[in-house]
Structures are given as C-alpha cells and as structure tokens.
C-alpha cells in the first residue's frame, strides 16, 4: 500500500478522476500481479468516490487528503445489500443522526484500514456513512480474520454493529433502496478488469497460446459494451454475458497454466495455484443472481 501511495495510485479517483482507460489498465496490472493487493487497494477507492459525490460538504475536507495520499487506508462494507431477506445492517433514526445495528458478514482490510464507508438499511432507504475505526469502540466488534481459500491476506472479518452512533456529520448520503439497486445492477454488469488482468498474467506465463487472441477479443468487446452508454434491459443482459465470458476466460487461463506447469503448480510458492484461486474468487465477487446464471451458462459451454 505504501508503494502504491508513493506512485500516486491512492488518488486515482480524486476529482478529476483518471480516464476510464487508465483506470482499467491499472486494475488489470495490479490484479494480475497480486490479487489480494489489488482487492485491498480497490476497496480503498470506495470512500474516495463516495466523498466526491456526497452533498455533505464537510466530509471531503476531513478525509480526502489523507485518503488520496495514502496516510489513511479506506475500506467498504455494503455487499450485503444485495442479499435477499431481512437487512443485515439496519439504521434507526435518533436525535442528531442514526443508531446502527447488525452484522456485516465480509469486511476486508480490518486492522489495515482506518476509515470505512458503510451502508445500512432504513426501511425503503439506504444510509451511507463513514466510520473511523481508530480508536476502537465497544459498539464495533470484529471477528478473528476469516480463513479463506483466496485473498487470505486481506484480513477479512465479520463486523458487528451494536448501537453504533453515527452523527449526521458523518453521513455521506441517504438514497432510495430501489435507486441503489438500479445503480448496482449496472455497476455489477460491467466487465471486471481484474479478470482480464489474471488472464493476461496466466497467458504471459504460458507463452504462445490461442488464449491471447481470445483475451484481446473479449476485452475489446466487453469494454465497448460498457462504454456504449446504453442502459436498457437488453444492453444490460449483454453486459452481464460479457462479464461472465471474462470470468470464464480467467478461470480457463489459470487452469491451463496449472495444467502446463504440472505438479509444481501445487506448491504454495508457485503463482499458478494462486492465480487459479484468485480467478475463482472473482467469479463470485460482486455476484448477482443474473451474473451467477450467466456465468454458469458460460461455464457449461466452455
């Protein structure tokens, strides 16, 4: 993280944000080099992006400089909003702000990040707010780091909120839940550059392979769809299929690398097994029902 900060990469989304083509290239390079470093780093940008859009004008002055210089690492907790059933984390209005209760099942960078952007349901709305976790508070309780098949160094925990007090001054936004869902459907349908980065890393290690041309074609088609600026249901479905194709390609490229490497690939010090585990992780990261179905359909054809 210190090296990425020194390179200016903690400020990638500081207004004016870097061009989308540059962002994608950086994502691909970092994901191919080390998936867990990429994952911790990419979540850091969520608070920066949300601060840039927040109507709470006092918040950027408090946090943007430290986040964008890397003096403070950011994290995020909101994926549970996609889950059906009762809300995992709930906001209750109180005098001067909100009371937060519930459990976030996956919170990355615990012990590394100091500032988290968190979401909580409030009936048909979502409250997004910032939590500075330093110093510790009794109303936040983290589990021991979860043991994971991939991204094990990400220090991912379950985080319990027990009457956490969030003042209005720390609120980023309050939006309708269906509005957030519509925005999230589009965001999770877009191509994942990390999948292309993993595929590219595997292809470099493989050498001459037809997968290289397939990667070029898949990347070009996926990014063209994402840049088309169309939001109708048909285009959204095409985006989801393209994302699934990219995920499938990453898994196949990593499997090919393991196969070509042979028994040495089973050593934990060999990149082939790591790339395969990371490719598997990205097949479920930010997964929606539509993406799950599209990915399963794509895998059945491969």
Task: Specify the residue positions occupied by each region the protein language model found.
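Glycine-rich beta->alpha junctions and the first turn(s) of the following alpha-helix
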Residues: 143-223
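C-terminal helix-coil-helix/basic helical segment that borders enzyme active sites and/or dimer interfaces
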Residues: 14, 215-269
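A generic structural signal for well-ordered coil/turn residues at beta-strand boundaries
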Residues: 72, 85, 112-114, 125, ...
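Predominant activation on well-ordered alpha-helical scaffold segments within soluble catalytic domains
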Residues: 24-28, 48, 196-204, 247, ...
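Buried hydrophobic positions in well-ordered alpha/beta secondary-structure cores of metabolic enzymes
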Residues: 26, 100-102, 161, 199, ...
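Glycine-rich flavin
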Residues: 1-101, 106-108
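DPxDG-like acidic metal-binding loop motif
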Residues: 103-135
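Glycine-rich phosphate/cofactor-binding loops in nucleotide/flavin-utilizing enzymes
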Residues: 264-302
């Amino acid at each position: 993280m210190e090296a990425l900060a020194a390179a200016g990469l903690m400020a990638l989304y500081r207004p004016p944000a870097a061009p989308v083509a540059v962002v994608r290239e950086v994502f691909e390079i970092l994901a191919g080099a080390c998936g867990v470093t990429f994952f911790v780093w990419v979540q850091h940008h969520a608070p920066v992006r949300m601060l840039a859009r927040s109507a709470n004008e006092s918040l950027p002055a408090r946090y943007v400089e430290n986040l964008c210089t890397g003096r403070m690492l950011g994290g995020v907790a909101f994926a549970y909003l996609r889950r059906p059933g009762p809300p995992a984390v709930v906001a209750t209005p109180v005098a001067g702000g909100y009371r937060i209760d519930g459990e976030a099942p996956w919170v990355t960078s615990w012990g590394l990040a100091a500032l988290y952007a968190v979401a909580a349901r409030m009936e048909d709305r979502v409250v997004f707010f910032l939590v500075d976790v330093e110093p510790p508070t009794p109303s936040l309780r983290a589990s021991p780091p979860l043991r994971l098949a991939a991204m094990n160094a990400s220090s991912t925990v379950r985080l319990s909120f027990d009457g956490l007090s969030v003042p209005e001054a720390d609120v980023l936004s309050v939006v309708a839940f269906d509005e957030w869902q519509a925005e999230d459907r589009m965001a999770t349908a877009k191509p994942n550059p990390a999948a292309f980065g993993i595929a590219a890393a595997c292809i470099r290690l493989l050498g001459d392979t037809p997968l290289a041309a397939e990667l070029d074609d898949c990347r070009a088609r996926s990014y063209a769809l994402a840049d088309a600026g169309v939001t109708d249901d048909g285009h959204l479905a095409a985006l989801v299929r393209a994302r699934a194709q990219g995920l499938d390609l990453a898994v196949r490229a990593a499997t090919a690398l393991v196969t070509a490497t042979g028994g040495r690939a089973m050593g934990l010090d060999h990149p082939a097994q790591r790339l395969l585990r990371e490719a598997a992780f990205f097949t479920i990261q930010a997964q929606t029902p539509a993406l799950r179905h599209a990915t399963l359909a794509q895998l059945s054809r491969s």
